[in-house]
From Swiss-Prot:
The encoding gene: rps11
Lineage: Eukaryota, Viridiplantae, Streptophyta, Embryophyta, Tracheophyta
PANTHER family linked: 40S RIBOSOMAL PROTEIN S14/30S RIBOSOMAL PROTEIN S11 (PTHR11759)
Protein's UniProt name: Small ribosomal subunit protein uS11c
GO biological process per UniProt: translation
Keyword rRNA-binding: yes
Native source species: Cucumis sativus
Length: 138
């Protein structure tokens, strides 16, 4: 019986380094999406292709702890650690959402050593669009 041809790039043949880490990205965009329940940090190149991402949930926080500022700080540090190794020096920051993690994530991004060209708040604001949900009665 003939031997099966080993598949290139599969986990079974022991290739450890990923193909994405070979790209050098000098400039990128950091998207922070801070809701009341979670904070998601996505790092893309200038064309919008995702390089790295992290969230408070993937960092090990569960339940209501995902919405805390410390969880957002951890998620931002986790997402940026990989792209600094790939050579990112400059970045634009887009912050979306009303959550507690906005400022903490921005503080973690500033501390990472990446030069920020600008910080923009891209939270969607309705011009009196849909009717909001009724008030909670607890």
């Amino acid at each position: 019986m003939a031997k099966p041809i080993p598949r290139i790039g599969s986990r079974r043949n022991g290739r450890i380094s990923s193909r994405k880490s070979t790209r050098r990205i000098p400039k990128g965009v950091i998207h922070v999406q801070a809701s009341f329940n979670n904070t998601i940090v996505t790092v893309t190149d200038v064309r919008g292709r995702v390089i790295s991402w992290s969230s408070a949930g993937t960092c090990g926080f569960k339940g209501t702890r995902r919405g805390t500022p410390f969880a957002a700080q951890t998620a931002a540090g986790n997402a940026i650690r990989g792209v600094v190794d790939q050579g990112m020096q400059r970045a634009e920051v887009m912050i979306k959402g009303p959550g507690l993690g906005r400022d903490a994530a921005l503080r973690a991004i500033r501390r990472s050593g990446i030069l920020l060209s600008f910080i923009r708040d891209v939270t969607p604001m309705p011009h009196n669009g849909c009717r909001p949900p009724k008030k909670r009665r607890v």
